C-alpha cells in the first residue's frame, strides 16, 4: 500500500521480511545494542569506498570535495545520535530498495540461521547485509537524509520510519533539497538509551569497534569547562579512530586486538577470527595480503556461485568487494584484504578474469592460507591444534574440494584432511593420512577405507571384519564429498588408497599362506553352490564367490574394481544423476552356518539365496525394491526352521 501526501511525501509499507527483522532487532538483540554504531559506521565507510571507486572514471562526482570522512555527533536536548558521511549517497530508488526491502535471496537463510542466542544472532546482522536496521535496537525513530553524488541538490531524499503507534511497519519517502552529497542518519533514541548521549561513550564505541576504518571518523572536540563543571562541545573537529589502512602498517606495530577489530569490519562478523596471516610480497609482483580464517562457517558457504570474501585495493584505493578471483572456490570462506601495487586503478571483474598478475596473487594467497592451516594442524601448541580441529569441523568439507580442483597444491591439501577411523572408533574426524601411515602394520602397503552414509553404517560394515581381526586400521568416510575426494586422490606418500568394498581383497604380506590356501580350497569345495546361487539370483549379481574378508557375517556385496561403488551410486541417484549401470558381486562366508546350511538346501534354496543377497544389500545401506517379499521370505524360513511346533 502506498499513500501520497500533499507535501510530496510518500508512505510505503515495509516488505514482510523487514517487519520480521525489525521485530527481531527491537525485541531480541537489545543486549547487543552496541553493534548499531559499528554497523552504521561500516556502511558509511563502504559508501566512501564506493564513491572513490566511481570517481576514478568520473572525478566530477567528488563535487570539489575529495576529502572523505565519517562524522558522529549527538544532541542531548533532542536525544539524537547522528552518523553522516560524504560518500556516494543514494537516489530515491536506491533508498526504497536498500532501506525498504531485503534481498529475497538472503531472507530465508537469515531467519533459518537464527538460534535465539543473542550473541550468536548478532553476528549474522552484518553478514547478511542488514546492519542498517540495527539502528532500531536503540532508536524508535530513524531519519535518513541523502543525496547521490552527481545528482542535483533538489534530488535529495528524506526517509523516515517511526516504530511506534499506528505507523510501525511503515516508512515515508520525500524529495528534499540537499546541498552536499552523502548520507546523514539520525537516531531518535528510545527511552533508557540516554547514556549514548555522551561524547565519552560514543568515542569508546568507535575505538572499540571501528578504530580500523580507513576514513577518519570525526567528532566535535570536548573540553572541560571549569565554570560549568562539565564537558562542553567545541567547534573543533577531532579524529577519533586511527584512520589508516591497517594492512599497510608493520605487523610489529599492530596489536592482536587491532587485527581482531579489523576482521570484524572486513568479515562482517561479530565473532573473533580463528587465525590470520599478514604479509607484504615484494619482487616482480608487489602486494600486501591480510587474510583471515573465520571461526564459523557463513550461511551461504555451500553456494559456490556466491561472491565471497576478499576486498581488493590498488595502492590503498578500494576497487571491489568479493574479488572471487583472488581465492580458489575451495577457500571461499577466507576473508580479508589484498592491496596490489601493480594492477591498474580501473581494473574490472572482466580484467581480473584474464590478468596474469591476479593469477600470481591468487597463487600466493592460496599458499599463504594453506601454510597457515598447516602450521595450526602440526603445531606443538595444543591451543593451535584445537584451533585446527575447530576449523575442520566448520570448513573441512569445503577444503576437501581442493583435492580435485587444485592439482598444484593437492598433496598439501591431502595432508590437511581429517577422517574418522577404526583406530578411535568415534565419529570425530581427527585422523590425518600421516597419522594413518605412522600406525600402519609391518608389511602393509595400502591405506584402506570404507565409504557409507553414516558413521554407524561405516563402522559396522561387514567389510571391516577381517581388518578388525588383524588389527588393521580403516578410514571411515561418511561425507558426501568423500567419494569425489577419493576419486581424485589415488595415493598419498606413495601408498595407494584402497576401498575395502571394491574388487578382490588383497592384503599382501598381511595375509599368510595358510589363509590363502584355505580360501582356494573353499572356492573349490563350494564351486557347485556358487554356480547354483548365481543361477538363482540371475541378473541381480555379476558373480558369486567365496570370500575371506568376512568372519561374522554370512555374505556381503562388493563392487567390481572399475565399477561405481554402491554408496556413490546412491549419492548420484539422490542428486538426480544416473550412475553407470553395474551389478554387484555377492561374496559368501564358507564358515558361516547359514552358508553351510544352504549347501545342502533343496526345497527353499531360492528363498535362502534371495535373503542372503537382500541382507547383504541392507548391510551396505541399500534399499530393497520389494520389502514385502523380503519379509514374507524371512517369515517362511523362520516357520520352516521352527518345524511343526504346536501341532502335536
Curated annotation (Swiss-Prot):
Residues of the region (B) are 350-570
Q: Where is the segment annotated C?
A: 571-648
Q: What Gene Ontology terms describe where this protein resides (cellular component)? A: cytoplasm
Q: Which UniProt keywords apply?
A: ATP-binding, Chaperone, Cytoplasm, Nucleotide-binding, Stress response
Does the keyword Ribonucleoprotein feature in the UniProt annotation?
A: no
* One Pfam family linked to the record: HATPase_c_3
Mind telling me which SMART domains this protein's record contains?
HATPase_c
| SUPFAM superfamilies named among the record's database cross-references | ATPase domain of HSP90 chaperone/DNA topoisomerase II/histidine kinase, HSP90 C-terminal domain, Ribosomal protein S5 domain 2-like
Q: Where is this region: A?
A: 1-349
Where does the protein end up?
A: Cytoplasm
Transmembrane segments annotated in the record for this chain: none
What is an example of a GO molecular function annotated in this UniProt entry? ATP hydrolysis activity
Highest taxon of source:
Bacteria
Family of the protein in this entry: Belongs to the heat shock protein 90 family.
Q: Return the NCBIfam families for the record.
A: PRK05218.1 (NF003555)
Quaternary structure, per UniProt, is: Homodimer.
Entry-linked HAMAP family: HSP90
Q: What does this protein do?
A: Molecular chaperone. Has ATPase activity.
| Protein name (database record) | Chaperone protein HtpG
Q: Which organism is it from?
A: Aromatoleum aromaticum (strain DSM 19018 / LMG 30748 / EbN1)
Amino acid at each position: 500500500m502506498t499513500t501520497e501526501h500533499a507535501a510530496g511525501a510518500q508512505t510505503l509499507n515495509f516488505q514482510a521480511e523487514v517487519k520480521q527483522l525489525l521485530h527481531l532487532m527491537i525485541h531480541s538483540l537489545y543486549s547487543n545494542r552496541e553493534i548499531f554504531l559499528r554497523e552504521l559506521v561500516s556502511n558509511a565507510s563502504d559508501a566512501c569506498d564506493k564513491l572513490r571507486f566511481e570517481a576514478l572514471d568520473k572525478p566530477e562526482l567528488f563535487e570539489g570535495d575529495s576529502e572523505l570522512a565519517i562524522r558522529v555527533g549527538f544532541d542531548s536536548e533532542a536525544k539524537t545520535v547522528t552518523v553522516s558521511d560524504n560518500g556516494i549517497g543514494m537516489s530515491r530508488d536506491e533508498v526504497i530498495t536498500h532501506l525498504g526491502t531485503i534481498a529475497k535471496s538472503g531472507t530465508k537463510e537469515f531467519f533459518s540461521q537464527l538460534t535465539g542466542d543473542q550473541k550468536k544472532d548478532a553476528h549474522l546482522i552484518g553478514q547478511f547485509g542488514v546492519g542498517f536496521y540495527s539502528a532500531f535496537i536503540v532508536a524508535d525513530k530513524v531519519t535518513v537524509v541523502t543525496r547521490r553524488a552527481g545528482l542535483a541538490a533538489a534530488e535529495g531524499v528524506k526517509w523516515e520510519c517511526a516504530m511506534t503507534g499506528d505507523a510501525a511497519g511503515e516508512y515515508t519517502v520525500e524529495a528534499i533539497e540537499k546541498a552536499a552529497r552523502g548520507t546523514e542518519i539520525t537516531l531518535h533514541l528510545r527511552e533508557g538509551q540516554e547514556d549514548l548521549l555522551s561524547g565519552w561513550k560514543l568515542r569508546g564505541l568507535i575505538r572499540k569497534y571501528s578504530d580500523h576504518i580507513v576514513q577518519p571518523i570525526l567528532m566535535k572536540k570536548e573540553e572541560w569547562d571549569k565554570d560549568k563543571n562539565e564537558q562542553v562541545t567545541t567547534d573543533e573537529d577531532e579524529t577519533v579512530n586511527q584512520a589508516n589502512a591497517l594492512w599497510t602498517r608493520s605487523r610489529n606495530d599492530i596489536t592482536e586486538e587491532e587485527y581482531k577489530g579489523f576482521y570484524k569490519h572486513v568479515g562482517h562478523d561479530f565473532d573473533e577470527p580463528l587465525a590470520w596471516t599478514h604479509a607484504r610480497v615484494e619482487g616482480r609482483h608487489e602486494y600486501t595480503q591480510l587474510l583471515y580464517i573465520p571461526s564459523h562457517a557463513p550461511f551461504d558457504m555451500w553456494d559456490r556461485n556466491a561472491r565471497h570474501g576478499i576486498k581488493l585495493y590498488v595502492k590503498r584505493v578500494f576497487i571491489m568487494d568479493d574479488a572471487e578471483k583472488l581465492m580458489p572456490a575451495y577457500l571461499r570462506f577466507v576473508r580479508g584484504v589484498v592491496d596490489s601495487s601493480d594492477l591498474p586503478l580501473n581494473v574490472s571483474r572482466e580484467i581480473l578474469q584474464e590478468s596474469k598478475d591476479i593469477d600470481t596473487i591468487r597463487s600466493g594467497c592460496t599458499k599463504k592460507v594453506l601454510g597457515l592451516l598447516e602450521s595450526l594442524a602440526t603445531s606443538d601448541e595444543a591451543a593451535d591444534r584445537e584451533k585446527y580441529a575447530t576449523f575442520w569441523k566448520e570448513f573441512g568439507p569445503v577444503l576437501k574440494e581442493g583435492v580435485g580442483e587444485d592439482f598444484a597444491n593437492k598433496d598439501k591439501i591431502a595432508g590437511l584432511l581429517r577422517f574418522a577411523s577404526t583406530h578411535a572408533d568415534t565419529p570425530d574426524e581427527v585422523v590425518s593420512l600421516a597419522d594413518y601411515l605412522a600406525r600402519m602394520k609391518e608389511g602393509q602397503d595400502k591405506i584402506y577405507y570404507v565409504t557409507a552414509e553414516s558413521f554407524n553404517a561405516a563402522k559396522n560394515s561387514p567389510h571391516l571384519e577381517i581388518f578388525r581381526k588383524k588389527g588393521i586400521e580403516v578410514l571411515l568416510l561418511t561425507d558426501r564429498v568423500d567419494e569425489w575426494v577419493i576419486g581424485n586422490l589415488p595415493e598419498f606418500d606413495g601408498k595407494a588408497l584402497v576401498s575395502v568394498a571394491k574388487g578382490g581383497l588383497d592384503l599382501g604380506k598381511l595375509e599368510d599362506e595358510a589363509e590363502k590356501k584355505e580360501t582356494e580350497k573353499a572356492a573349490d569345495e563350494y564351486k557347485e553352490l556358487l554356480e547354483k546361487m548365481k543361477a538363482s539370483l540371475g541378473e541381480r549379481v555379476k558373480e558369486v564367490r567365496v570370500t575371506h574378508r568376512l568372519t561374522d557375517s554370512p555374505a556381503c556385496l562388493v563392487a567390481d574394481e572399475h565399477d561405481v561403488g554402491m554408496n556413490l551410486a546412491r549419492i548420484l541417484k539422490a542428486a538426480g544423476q544416473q550412475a553407470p549401470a553395474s551389478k554387484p558381486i555377492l561374496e559368501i562366508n564358507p564358515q558361516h552356518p547359514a552358508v553351510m546350511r544352504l549347501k545342502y538346501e533343496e526345497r527353499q534354496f531360492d528363498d535362502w539365496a534371495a535373503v542372503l543377497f537382500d541382507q547383504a544389500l541392507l548391510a551396505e545401506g541399500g534399499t530393497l525394491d520389494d520389502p514385502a517379499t523380503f519379509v514374507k521370505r524371512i517369515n517362511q524360513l523362520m516357520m520352516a526352521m521352527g518345524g511343526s511346533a504346536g501341532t502335536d
